[in-house]
Amino acid sequence: MAKVGKTIEHPVTGERITFLETAASTDGTLLKMAFEMRPRAFIAGAHAHPRQEERFAVGSGRIRVKTGGREWIADEGDEISVPRGAGHTWGNPFDEPAQVVVELRPALRAETYFETYFGLARDGRVSARNGLPSLLQFALMLHEYRDEFAGPPPLGAPGAVLAAILSPLARARGYRARYGTYEDPDGP
């Protein structure tokens, strides 16, 4: 579990996250993170949070958010909320860095997902092209964290079925949905 103040980095996407509030510090109410994004940073693939609302507050720079067929350019001081279950994508395609505070409500296990995903990247276990782990690792993580992350409607259901089918194979091949080495050794 992440601790307040812990910072993790994804060397391929150029994202840096500092945990401002965690599941433990808020009794599960929210996960609050400061994202630092380099110019023209990797744009997150379309996804949804089946049981979480996501909020973005731009501290500096700007980001692009797409959801429900609409696109917003959010500048410094702007805030955007994406309702639970809504497919969306977001990132920094611009020429300047961006700092964004992201909240997920409730927290669920999203911090463990981020610790695992960024830890895999730090250890060179993701694609240098797109920053994603192997198909089996990704399928296992999507299945394990299906309350936190899913493909956007209408792709979410087939993706969830495929992840469920591939998860036993991934485990048999030695993949895990979380690795203790990526989590804070002192706990919450």
Region spans (language model):
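Short amphipathic
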Residues: 32-36
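Jelly-roll (double-stranded beta-helix
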Residues: 1-30, 41-46, 50-52, 57, ...
